[in-house]
């Protein structure tokens, strides 16, 4: 039987044995029989499958099609899956720092969805969060300049209340940024040979081989790059593994089966300043880690396993729950298991044989740099599935902006988890620096010392980070922050923030008051509520706030107030809300001044209609009336 399944079997059988040896527990005995039958079934499919290496796309223009399809993941019936240009998962996108990239994302599914560029620093309207919905049969075309450092990023769906289902079905992919600093280092970068992307996830299947999608289910079977029982052949030299936790909820405590040392060279936001040696690294949902492992000490033909050493983790570790039954049970819970089998092959030409002593020269923000401090508390969840986890007792509402941040502010956020369960916290737009765990700077692990966009907040702890919100502002389109467990974010463990530009004023070239459009015409002595739409040209793309009330002249009694918005880069419209009551008819005149331009709009007020609507006569002849 495969080593992976032997580990599962021995752990589960041992657990059930100790729970039943002193008591006649029919439920546990039945569970034991079920597990043994499952393990025998597993043994029939224990052969390894070659790890699928995602195909690549590079350049500045990318065509991506999201589609529903089928995948042969198990013996028997095919599994309904979704992918990007593939049956499961998507291509690896190679981009260069400084380039402007154009994405052509077509949704060929029957459901609406989104694609979020996880870890990317980009305008909010291009971010691909819950607001950038791609309906079925439509094309979304975001574009932005790559400002990120070289590193391993990814893309995945982010439609509110559908993220769990779409992630489970397989939508996602890697995005690798190159830059001159990383390219100058002697690092493995022959993609698919000594530079391997590894997406870790697991799934549970029903009786017809379909994925089980519920918000409390851990997977029972590993899928590494969508490959069950995956193995890969790697050369006898230093190799680079770019590992992503693409799970729904499970964490991984990663290491090698022979306990060999490896070197962490990067995490979410790019390279660390110096390598960190380790034999274990915890990787939570959404996090990435780049490691170098020396296979030069092995012989050709040797094999080893990349393992998840998930047994005996601290209470609250996602996937550390004991047992295979119950709401949170899983065959992979609280055990050590294989995530990738590795076979050592011959050395390639021009191998990498050492680890660079210095990788980068990152300068990080500190607590002292922060001018604004914010606190978030993870709440809810204590009463089970009917009380979902949220932030600050507030469930996500797509119409509510939870935080407003000023452009170029450096902020310190502290996320506190007084809850029963550990969570991962992800924020869009920025890379941050973790500065303290439980208020202690020295408690931050070396492996998480670089730029991050995801951090793990264990139960009963708090974690602080510092970030600068620069380059992009938009008073209308928000970014997200959320737990990166797909089930939790779908249930409302998410908030949103906007970045306001208070330093740059909105400007326009022309203002077309003479062609203003009015939603309605006011009548004297009648309360009026309407709008005026005024066209402009030459907008500079800057956000603006609600304006002060402008009182009418000529006919008085009305006020016009500019509605908040963001200027287009070019032509667009300003909208003013007009309210009030006039005493007379005539022309109400408003003096508009905006963005360096002034003009008048004129609104015609009609006369008051008669209050008495009874018929009017000039005389009445009552002669002869008795």
Language model region names:
Residues 117-121, 248-262, 426-432, 545-555, ...:
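Short acidic, flexible loop segments centered on an aromatic residue
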Residues 47-292, 312-314, 324-380, 462-466, ...:
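Histidine-centered copper-binding motifs that mark active-site loops
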Residues 117-119, 125-130, 134, 263-275, ...:
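Active-site pocket scaffolds in enzymes
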Residues 150-152, 238, 301-303, 462, ...:
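Extracellular Ig-like/FN3 beta-sandwich strand-entry sites
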Residues 106-110, 244-249, 381, 416-420, ...:
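Short solvent-exposed strand-capping/beta-turn motif centered on an Asx-Ser/Thr pair
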Residues 153-158, 297-312, 474-485:
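Short, surface-exposed ligand- or partner-binding patches at beta-edge/loop junctions that are enriched
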């Amino acid at each position: 039987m495969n080593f992976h399944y032997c580990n599962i079997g021995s752990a589960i059988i041992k657990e059930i044995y100790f729970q039943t040896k002193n008591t006649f527990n029919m439920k546990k005995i039945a569970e034991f029989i079920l597990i043994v039958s499952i393990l025998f079934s597993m043994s029939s499919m224990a052969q390894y499958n070659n790890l699928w290496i995602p195909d690549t796309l590079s350049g500045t223009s990318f065509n991506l099609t999201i589609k529903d399809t089928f995948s042969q993941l198990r013996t028997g019936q095919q599994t309904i899956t979704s992918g990007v240009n593939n049956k499961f998962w998507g291509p690896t996108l190679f981009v260069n720092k400084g380039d402007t990239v154009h994405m052509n994302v077509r949704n060929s599914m029957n459901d609406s969805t989104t694609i979020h560029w996880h870890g990317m620093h980009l305008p909010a309207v291009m971010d691909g969060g819950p607001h950038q919905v791609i309906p079925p049969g439509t094309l979304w075309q975001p574009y932005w300049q790559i400002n990120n450092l070289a590193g391993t990023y990814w893309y995945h769906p982010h439609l509110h209340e559908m993220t769990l289902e779409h992630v489970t079905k397989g939508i996602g992919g890697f995005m690798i940024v190159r830059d001159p600093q990383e390219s100058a280092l002697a690092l493995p970068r022959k993609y698919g040979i000594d530079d391997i992307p590894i997406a870790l996830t697991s799934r549970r299947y029903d009786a017809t081989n379909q994925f089980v999608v519920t918000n409390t289910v851990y997977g029972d079977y590993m899928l590494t790059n969508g490959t069950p029982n995956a193995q890969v052949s790697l050369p006898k030299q230093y190799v680079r593994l770019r590992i992503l936790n693409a799970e729904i909820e499970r964490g991984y405590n990663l290491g090698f089966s022979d306990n060999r040392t490896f070197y962490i060279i990067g995490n979410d936001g790019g390279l660390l300043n110096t390598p960190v040696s380790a034999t274990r690294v915890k990787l939570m949902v959404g996090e990435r880690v780049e490691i170098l492992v020396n296979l030069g000490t092995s012989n050709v033909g040797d094999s080893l396993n990349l393992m998840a050493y998930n047994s005996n983790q601290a209470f609250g570790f996602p996937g550390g729950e004991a047992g295979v039954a119950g709401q949170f049970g899983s065959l992979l819970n609280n055990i050590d298991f294989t995530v990738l089998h590795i076979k050592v092959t011959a050395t390639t030409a021009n191998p990498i044989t050492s680890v660079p002593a210095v990788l980068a020269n990152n300068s990080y923000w500190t607590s002292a740099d922060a001018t604004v401090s914010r606190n978030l508390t993870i709440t809810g969840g204590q009463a089970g599935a009917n009380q979902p986890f949220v932030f600050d007792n507030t469930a996500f509402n797509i119409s509510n902006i939870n935080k407003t941040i000023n452009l170029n502010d450096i902020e310190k956020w502290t996320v506190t988890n007084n809850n029963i369960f550990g969570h991962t916290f992800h924020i869009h737009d920025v890379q941050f620096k973790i500065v303290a765990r439980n208020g202690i700077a020295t408690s931050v692990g070396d492996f998480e010392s670089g730029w991050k966009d995801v951090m793990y907040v264990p139960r009963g702890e708090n974690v602080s980070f510092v970030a600068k919100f620069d380059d992009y502002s938009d008073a209308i389109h928000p970014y997200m922050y959320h737990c990166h467990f797909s089930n939790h974010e779908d249930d409302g463990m998410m908030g949103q923030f906007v970045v306001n530009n208070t330093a740059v004023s909105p400007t326009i070239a022309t203002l077309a008051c003479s062609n203003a459009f009015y939603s309605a015409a006011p009548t004297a002595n009648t309360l009026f509520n309407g709008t005026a739409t005024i066209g402009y040209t030459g907008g500079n793309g800057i956000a603006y706030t609600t304006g002060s009330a402008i009182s009418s002249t000529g006919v008085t009694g009305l006020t016009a107030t500019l509605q908040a918005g963001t200027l287009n880069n070019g032509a667009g419209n300003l909208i003013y809300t007009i309210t009030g009551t006039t005493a007379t008819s005539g022309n109400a005149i408003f003096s508009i001044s905006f963005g360096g331009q002034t003009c008048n709009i004129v609104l015609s007020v009609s006369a008051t209609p008669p209050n008495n609507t009874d018929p009017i006569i000039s005389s009445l002849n009552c002669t002869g009336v008795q």
